[in-house]
């Protein structure tokens, strides 16, 4: 059971000199226990958000923009929700207070052919957490995270650069992140300061049938010895308005730093599972290629579009997680280390078919392979085989959306998401700490489970009442996950692997709503 409330408003002056938009939302969700064991599969959630965006034009050729967003979020999963976390068998609880804002100044000249932008943003996150099991009184934690960014960018449109008209873009950016995460019960007091100075240049040439974009970015990261050079090239061929083909090459990297998922502590067998970074962890580099053809046609009163895309990404020094043992407190430790490499490649097909507002259908399907180049260990158990499969990456996935407005004031939509089979790690508990009557409730050793596939179908109906010329009242209702496609082999009880969860995150859910617009 849950509720969602939301409101937004906007105001723009008649001469477009200034404007402001505000939004606010509230969401509440009760915990959901799918298998009746007293432990939630879907946690309790309370969230408030508020934000605003505003702009002011001092002159015809300048613009100042300001935005502010705040989120207050409480999440809790586990059991015995009426008790304090340290009185339960398992609790994963976080409370986030996030405040962020941004300020930018844009100036144009020569009939908007040139633009100079300066921008800055800041985000502060204050998080209080509890990740513990078996009435652990010391599993509380606190995290403070501050990120700020400043930068500038120039965009210029020129009649000719070398051989054709072009749009030139260049900019510089500095980013600073300070993170302090304390969990004394797990003997973790981590401080991380990340400083990144970057610059980028690109040029887009526009010819009769071709558009060529070439550029690069250089980043200096304080946790990486040498600057990272990341080039990219994009070539678009468009002989007609109804057909185009594109080739793209790009590069990127992930720095050897702690990310948000590294601060999360799951529970297996009543003990915590921590993630640590390996000594000498190197950055992960990516090299991506893609090609696509896009065809549009009108067949009678029908509009059609077909997109076929092939993609390939090579990852070097790919980040992998391996279970390496236990710390002095008996908590399982996973280490983020560099693997040999990985390859992600496949084909994607998207199609659209529409007949005005009467009916529109969009369908997409992807065939993908995500494999390590060599077998990688993921468990400390020597009897568990290493794998080439990248975890939690299906080989097949797709979606469809069908919308229709068969008569005035009524419209409907049917949508679905297909998720193919994937390999998901399932960790066994330490049986030396489990009571004898629980021993046969859990797997005996770590397993890489080949999951079933899922089809998540959703239905929504809308009817709009026109109250007067300016106010409309919409009533809507429907069902999400109509077939209740949900994981069947959930771990049960207080010694379960709380990270063993896959597939749709929401069970069959009925909803009704009211929307008023002016």
Regions found by a protein language model. Give the residues of each.
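Gram-negative outer-membrane beta-barrel transporters
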Residues: 206, 305-306, 310-314, 335-429, ...
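Surface-exposed extracellular loop regions of Gram-negative outer-membrane beta-barrel proteins
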Residues: 15-34, 117-130, 167-175, 190-232, ...
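Flexible loop and strand-edge segments within Gram-negative outer membrane beta-barrel domains
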Residues: 29-49, 57-114, 122-145
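Structural signature of Gram-negative outer-membrane beta-barrels, strongest in the C-terminal barrel
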Residues: 59, 163-167, 187-314, 366, ...
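Membrane-embedded beta-barrel scaffold of Gram-negative outer-membrane proteins
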Residues: 7-9, 16, 22, 117-131, ...
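Outer-membrane beta-barrel transmembrane domain signature of Gram-negative proteins
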Residues: 94-98, 122, 126-130, 135-212, ...
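C-terminal beta-signal and adjacent terminal beta-strands/loops
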Residues: 316, 418-436, 463-518
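Outer-membrane beta-barrel translocator/receptor signature
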Residues: 1-36, 43-50, 470
């Amino acid at each position: 059971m849950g509720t969602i409330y939301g409101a937004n408003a906007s105001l723009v002056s008649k001469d477009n000199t200034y404007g402001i938009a505000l939004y606010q939302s509230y969401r509440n969700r009760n915990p959901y226990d799918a298998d009746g064991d007293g432990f939630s599969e879907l946690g309790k959630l309370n969230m408030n958000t508020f934000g605003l965006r505003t702009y002011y034009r001092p002159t015809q050729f300048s613009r100042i923009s300001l935005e502010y967003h705040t989120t207050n979020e409480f999440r809790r999963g586990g059991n015995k929700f009426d008790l304090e976390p340290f009185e339960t068998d398992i609790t994963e609880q976080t409370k986030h207070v996030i405040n962020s804002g941004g300020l930018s100044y844009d100036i144009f000249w020569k009939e908007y052919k040139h633009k100079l932008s300066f921008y800055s943003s800041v985000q502060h996150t204050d998080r209080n957490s509890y990740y513990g099991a078996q009435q652990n009184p010391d599993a509380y934690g606190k995290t403070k995270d501050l990120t700020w960014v400043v930068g500038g960018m120039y965009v210029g449109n020129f009649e000719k650069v070398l051989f054709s008209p072009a749009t030139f873009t260049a900019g510089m950016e500095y980013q600073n992140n300070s993170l302090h995460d304390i969990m004394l019960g797990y003997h973790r007091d981590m401080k991380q300061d990340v400083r990144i100075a970057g610059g980028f240049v690109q040029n887009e040439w526009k010819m009769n049938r071709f558009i060529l974009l070439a550029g690069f970015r250089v980043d200096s990261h304080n946790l990486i010895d040498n600057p990272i050079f990341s080039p990219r090239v994009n070539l678009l061929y468009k002989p007609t308005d109804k057909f185009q083909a594109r080739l793209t090459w790009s590069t990127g990297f992930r720095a050897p730093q702690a990310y948000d998922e590294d601060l999360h502590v799951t529970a297996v067998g009543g003990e915590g599972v921590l993630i640590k970074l390996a000594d000498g962890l190197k950055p992960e580099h990516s090299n991506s290629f893609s090609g696509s053809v896009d065809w549009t046609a009108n067949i009678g009163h029908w509009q059609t579009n077909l997109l076929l895309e092939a993609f390939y990404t090579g990852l070097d020094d790919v980040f992998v997680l391996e279970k390496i043992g236990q710390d002095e407190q008996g908590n399982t430790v996973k280490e983020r280390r560099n693997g040999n490499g990985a390859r992600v490649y496949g084909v994607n097909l998207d199609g659209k078919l529409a007949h005005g507002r009467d009916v529109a259908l969009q369908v997409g399907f992807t065939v993908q392979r995500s494999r390590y180049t060599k077998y990688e260990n993921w468990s400390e158990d020597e009897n568990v085989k290493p794998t080439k499969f990248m975890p939690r990456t299906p080989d097949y996935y797709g979606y469809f959306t069908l919308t229709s407005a068969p008569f005035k004031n009524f419209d409907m939509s049917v949508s679905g998401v297909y998720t193919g089979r994937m390999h998901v790690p399932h960790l066994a508990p330490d049986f030396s700490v489990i009571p004898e009557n629980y021993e046969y409730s859990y797997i005996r050793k770590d397993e890489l489970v080949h999951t079933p596939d899922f089809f998540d179908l959703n239905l929504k109906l809308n009817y709009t009442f026109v109250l007067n010329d300016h106010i409309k009242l919409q009533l809507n209702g429907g069902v999400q996950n109509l077939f209740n496609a949900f994981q069947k082999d959930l771990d049960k009880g207080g010694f379960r692997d709380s990270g063993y969860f896959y597939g749709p995150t929401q069970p069959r859910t009925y909803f009704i709503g009211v929307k008023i617009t002016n």
